[in-house]
């Protein structure tokens, strides 16, 4: 049986769950088999995941344990959402996280290259551009 630790943390509302596993100071998150197993018993409406690199086809990450945990999050979500810095488009990393078309929504800080945008639209992926509002 997997124990899910329920903890209230400072935020604007909702709940936060600390799933356990091996804590990484580098990524400020938990990873490993315990984390992946705990995610496997959950179902989320939406999962927001980030990636440090993406090319025309996929999102990538340089750490295997991060990829496994993020893949588990995507599998447990009804609406997988990728958040990516537009400057990271056109780059790859060692591990393939997911095909870009597997995400229902992609949020970037700048428009994606037209060829990628067209392919994602064909696949039914919504692309949103995040911006700061002027005060």
Short names for language-model regions:
Residues 3-135:
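Conserved phosphate- and dinucleotide-binding cores of soluble alpha/beta proteins
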